[in-house]
């Protein structure tokens, strides 16, 4: 599975939008930045459709999905953006309220 398969099922989160998480799904995809390696992608099924999260949020869910479900399902998350100087690009993070 690659990231395009994820993008066909889930949308990129809109910055500043509030999403209520109903269910979680964890997928492993080919890493487009590191060929031959894989990365985890967390798909959050929300009240506004499916959105995806990568990096720390997906890694934490991969380590303990039961804990991720306990922390996220039924909660509202807000997507925000920050600039990562090491990667030299904007990344998305989520605030849980």
Language model features: what each stretch is:
Residues 1-97:
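Short beta-rich binding modules
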């Amino acid at each position: 599975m690659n990231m395009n398969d994820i993008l066909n099922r889930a949308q990129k989160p809109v910055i500043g939008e509030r999403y209520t998480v109903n269910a979680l799904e964890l997928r492993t995809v080919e890493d487009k930045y590191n060929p031959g390696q894989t990365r985890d992608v967390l798909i959050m099924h929300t009240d506004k459709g499916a959105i995806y999260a990568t990096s720390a949020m997906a890694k934490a869910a991969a380590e303990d999905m039961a804990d991720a479900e306990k922390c996220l399902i039924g909660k509202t998350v807000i997507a925000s953006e920050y600039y990562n100087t090491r990667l030299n690009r904007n990344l998305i993070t989520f605030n849980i309220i």
